[in-house]
Amino acid sequence: MSTRGWLKIPLLSLALFLSLMSMTTTAHAFSDQVIQHGATGDDVVELQARLQYIGFYNKKIDGVFGWSTYWAVRNYQYEFGMEVDGLVGPEMKAKLEKTTNFNRDFVDRALTQGRKFTHYGGVPKQIQKGPKGSADERRRGREGVRQPRADRPGRDAPAAPRDERAPRREERPAPTPEPTPAPPEEPTPYEEAPDAQDDEANIEKATNVPAGYSDNDIQLMAQAVYGEARGEPYVGQVAVAAVILNRLNSPTFPDNVSGVIFEPLAFTAVADGQIYMTPDETARRAVLDALNGQDPSGGATYYFNPDTATSGWIWSRPQIKRIGKHIFCN
């Protein structure tokens, strides 16, 4: 075999290795949950990065499904002929995988370094970096007033004269030097244990709750309870959350939280848009109590307000009890 032929073998091997590495770094990692407004975590990071790659999202990648992400999702759905509902389900995830690219290693590394970047797609990786330290700024914003970091010389400058004066007093030959604080104790206000967080990506992780429900599920259920029953007695709010769970356990209804809540004509809050209001802590607590076994509804799968109900069918359902303004039934 000629020398040229021998040279082709390592080159082909290198090309194969690089192609395999490329496939590895761009593999998707979407979970099975339907991603919607209010969600947080790795799914949202991937969603934002993919939407940014194709030009639909131009805000920072922070792992929080806010309104900018919501409208980016709707615009993507419209452009690709899908149902425009702002929900990221299996169909949209599959479409994103076909139309975009996602390098998890690169995105995670940028987030780990606390960098704020808003140009993921179509830009060379070496310039896809914002000013370092955005993670620290976000953390300070969440935790309130904090002591200055020791690695930020601009903020620590006033402390330097104190550290320098103390040693000079000790060097003077005065017979009775006036007592001064020990120099090693000076820097103590600047020792910050939380700095260890710099080694982790600044992303809010989705949290699992009882029975395997994700934080995304909790958020959506809390929005439904708030939209349907705010102002009702607390037990009535728990009962509304219990109805959602009872439907999940019934073969008559969808088998996931978003499917139950967004089923056509199922909830008034979805029809009038109140589902997108920000829930309060009471609504969230009601959901958690229902998840932990409380069911004031008595196993109901329906409820209605007798003062506003116009459907003859709902009045025909076997009634269980009334809590506040709602009648619960099956």
UniProtKB/Swiss-Prot annotation:
Keyword Signal: yes
Gene3D superfamilies cross-referenced by the UniProt entry: 6.20.240.60, Cell wall hydrolase SleB, domain 1 (1.10.10.2520), PGBD-like superfamily/PGBD (1.10.101.10)
Name of the protein: Spore cortex-lytic enzyme
Signal peptide span: 1-29
Protein function: Required for spore cortex hydrolysis during germination.
Chain spans, region Disordered: 117-195
Organism in which the protein naturally occurs: Halalkalibacterium halodurans (strain ATCC BAA-125 / DSM 18197 / FERM 7344 / JCM 9153 / C-125) (Bacillus halodurans)
Residue ranges with Pro residues bias: 174-187
Assigned keywords, A-Z: Cell wall biogenesis/degradation, Germination, Hydrolase, Signal, Sporulation
NCBIfam families: spore_SleB
